């Protein structure tokens, strides 16, 4: 089961997407569908077929976001989080081979598009990191075995209010 937590920035991004789809893109595509339908024969009308398909995709995403947003719980930064890994943290870790990774722990709904440096709170890596501190070692169970990592830094975005 997916965790229904989200950062304020992630929530705002999803809300902006919903507003854009509903208030701008959907009316524009609806107008194109109406125009294409007015041309007559719809069976061989590529504009009509394409825009009708696009309208269905928009409607599907609007329904998904409209149902999802009220279910999400926004987690804001709290000063008590400083020094430990919690939801919303940017964490830099390193393994014995010197491989360094930096990512942010977020809700599963925030991981889409260009969010390649985000990991889900539900992932094994995030679960292993929770409540750990800088300079602490931790283990992650992976399909190829247990991996050991070291925490270099923990940061929070404090301006997300």
UniProtKB/Swiss-Prot annotation:
One of its GO terms (biological process) is regulation of DNA-templated transcription elongation. Pfam families: GreA_GreB, GreA_GreB_N. Transmembrane segments: none annotated. The keyword Kinase does not apply. NCBIfam families: greB, PRK01885.1. Belongs to the GreA/GreB family. GreB subfamily. Necessary for efficient RNA polymerase transcription elongation past template-encoded arresting sites. The arresting sites in DNA have the property of trapping a certain fraction of elongating RNA polymerases that pass through, resulting in locked ternary complexes. Cleavage of the nascent transcript by cleavage factors such as GreA or GreB allows the resumption of elongation from the new 3'terminus. GreB releases sequences of up to 9 nucleotides in length. This is Transcription elongation factor GreB. It comes from Vibrio cholerae serotype O1 (strain ATCC 39315 / El Tor Inaba N16961). The gene is greB.
